[in-house]
Amino acid sequence: MANVFFDVQFGGDAPKKIVFKLYDDVVPKTAANFRELATGSRGFGYKGSVFHRVITDFMAQGGDFTNFNGTGGKSIYGEKFADENFKLKHTKPALLSMANAGPNTNGSQFFITFVPCPWLDGKHVVFGEVVDGFDTLELFKKNSSQQGKPKTTIKIVDSGVV
C-alpha cells in the first residue's frame, strides 16, 4: 500500500515533508482510516489541521480537523471506532499511534513518538512509522514544550499518498 505524506508548516516557514509507512498487514482498518483522512477522499481530513499538543521528550499529537484543539475529529467509519489490536508496541521513536479517550474511542487523532513509550502499550494502537523527513521530526521536537503547547503554529498544509 502507498505511504502517506504530510507537508507541515512551522510558523510562517516553508512547509517540510514527512512520510509515513503504515502497517496495513497488522492493522488494516486503522491504516485505511489514516490514509483516507490524509487524502481527504471522503470530503474531510487532515489537510489544514494543526498539531495541537507537542510534549518535550514524548510526542506530537494532531488530527483534530473539526475543533483544532484536541476535542474533535472523526474517523472514516463514523465518530469513533474500536481498538483494532495491540500487537505492535511503542518500542522506538518515530512511531505513529492512535490518540484516544479510553478503550475503543479512536477517531482521527494520532501522535508521533519522540521516544519509546512502553506505558502506552495495550492502550493505544500503533499503526505506522516515519520513513522519511526525520529533519521534520526534529522540528517538532524543537517546537515542543513541557506543557504541550507548541512554540509556534504547526499546520498540515497538504497531505496525501506517495
UniProtKB/Swiss-Prot annotation:
Pfam families: Pro_isomerase (PF00160). Coiled coil: none annotated. One of its GO terms (cellular component) is cytoplasm. Residues 5-161 form the PPIase cyclophilin-type domain. Its EC number is 5.2.1.8. GO terms for molecular function: cyclosporin A binding; peptidyl-prolyl cis-trans isomerase activity. GO terms for biological process: protein folding. Binds cyclosporin A (CsA). CsA mediates some of its effects via an inhibitory action on PPIase. Keywords: Isomerase, Rotamase. It is an enzyme of class 5 (isomerase). It comes from the Eukaryota. It catalyses: [protein]-peptidylproline (omega=180) = [protein]-peptidylproline (omega=0). PPIases accelerate the folding of proteins. It catalyzes the cis-trans isomerization of proline imidic peptide bonds in oligopeptides. Belongs to the cyclophilin-type PPIase family. PPIase A subfamily. This is Peptidyl-prolyl cis-trans isomerase. The lineage of its organism: Eukaryota, Sar, Alveolata, Ciliophora, Intramacronucleata.
